[in-house]
From Swiss-Prot:
Protein name from the UniProt record: Structure-specific endonuclease subunit SLX1
Domain GIY-YIG: residue ranges: 14-95
Cofactor (UniProt): a divalent metal cation
Keywords: DNA damage, DNA recombination, DNA repair, Endonuclease, Hydrolase, Metal-binding, Nuclease, Nucleus, Zinc, Zinc-finger
Natural source organism: Phaeosphaeria nodorum (strain SN15 / ATCC MYA-4574 / FGSC 10173) (Glume blotch fungus)
EC number, UniProt record: 3.1.-.-
GO molecular function, a single term: zinc ion binding
First and last residue of the signal peptide: none
Amino acid sequence: MSEALKIESRPIPAFYCCYLLRSKNRKSYYIGSTPNPARRLGQHNGSSKGGAKRTSMQGKRPWEMTCIVTGFPSKFAALQFEWAWQNTHATRHIDKDVRDARAEELQKGKKKATSPGRRRKRPPMSLEARLKNLHHLLSVDSFCRWPLNLRFFAPDVFVQWERHTTKMTTTLRKSITIQLTPAEIPKLASDVSTELQTHFIPEVIRAIPVAYEDCKQYIEKSRRVLEDDQRLGCGVCKNPADMSSSLILVCPIEACQTVSHLSCLSNKFLTEGGELETLVPLEGTCPGCRSCIKWATMIKELSLRTNGEEELKLLFKPKRKRKSDNPAESDAADGQALEQEDEELDETWMEDMSQDEEPSPVKKSR
């Protein structure tokens, strides 16, 4: 396959998300991004090395992961969204009039200290403000067509999300998935192997697939279909589907054998959705089985199949059984392994940027 046909030099990351942490005193929050939520939560709570300086103060631990935004096509995309979420008052992804309105709302009752020509300081933000800002970002042109989904772990935060966002004028695309999967707040547990106090990571967060596990069955199916001796035809244009000259997509439905040229299926999906003015579709109907298919699902498999030689070797490598039955010890072992696997991907570039905390209801702000 020629270089011109390659969509990227590396496959789309297995997983990348932005997250919102809340401290145990429920007055401090932290927004970050990571390729592995379980490992990152352990870092913030001091169970493994790493984590932001701002979350390292013992008085604020344990931190709980209240929600995550998933589906980012690259680490740079996640970092872009992370910065915009942290700095909604300054990001250019939101129209200036909306930015100003949001900043004015947050500054109500507070003395303005910004002089003309000087960059506006980040206003203090409550949980409500952070959730409203998140809703704004998910609906703006820059991000609304990304394959993003929202998952909550804190039931009370999910309730606030529904309460505040239902009153907003902006709307989210219908295909975005918003779900609640409750997670326990991290609790201290004695680690007998090191005699240190570590925090258990909630099982629902540990169970998030972060290493292409959810693509394995799809890859196996695609290999069977594409390696078949029979001549394959595009499900859209009916012409031969030759992998040596074209990028070929395979339907992810297990019982369906339909393959299509990337350009043909893209045009079909865009036509179905009446979105010919855009470049990348969101979803569409398989020309074979007529199932509704997510475009991002097929592109992720294609990028892994064509550019993920090393990742595929790791994915199909036989796994050794874990010897330890101690959850705390297992957490530590997992953290070390994951740290080696994604150390270069886990971004901490925002650590030194201060994030204003929600003001205490007892003390008056100066």
